[in-house]
Amino acid sequence: MVESAFQPFSGDADEWFEEPRPQAGFFPSADWHLLKRDETYAAYAKDLDFMWRWVIVREERIVQEGCSISLESSIRAVTHVLNYFGMTEQRAPAEDRTGGVQH
């Protein structure tokens, strides 16, 4: 019987593709670039050489993350998500506002 070089998918892909998330919150290091900041959200991007990883943070918690092929496309994606969050907050009653994020 020939052994395969491929391992069966265990279903736990997070350990392969994602950086471990800090338990106490997101505090960007020097390799994260600030893309946008307002009174509620801050958005950062990090160059991984083959792509840019971006995160949107609210109260030191990552509320949205993604990746883009360039810094410019990261800015565009972050702007799109922040605009969506803004529209969601405008529609929600003041006591129910979550910024488009389910807690």
Curated annotation (Swiss-Prot):
Keywords: Monooxygenase, Oxidoreductase
InterPro entries found in the cross-reference section: MmoD
UniProt keyword annotation of Oxidoreductase present: yes
Entry keyword Oxidoreductase: yes
Any one Gene Ontology molecular-function term assigned to this protein's record: monooxygenase activity
Complex formation: The soluble methane monooxygenase (sMMO) consists of four components A/MMOH (composed of alpha/MmoX, beta/MmoY and gamma/MmoZ), B/MMOB (MmoB), C/MMOR (MmoC) and D/MMOD (MmoD).
Record NCBIfam families: sMetMonox_MmoD
Protein name in UniProt: Methane monooxygenase component D
Organism: Methylococcus capsulatus (strain ATCC 33009 / NCIMB 11132 / Bath)
Taxonomy of the source species: Bacteria, Pseudomonadati, Pseudomonadota, Gammaproteobacteria, Methylococcales
Encoding gene per record: mmoD
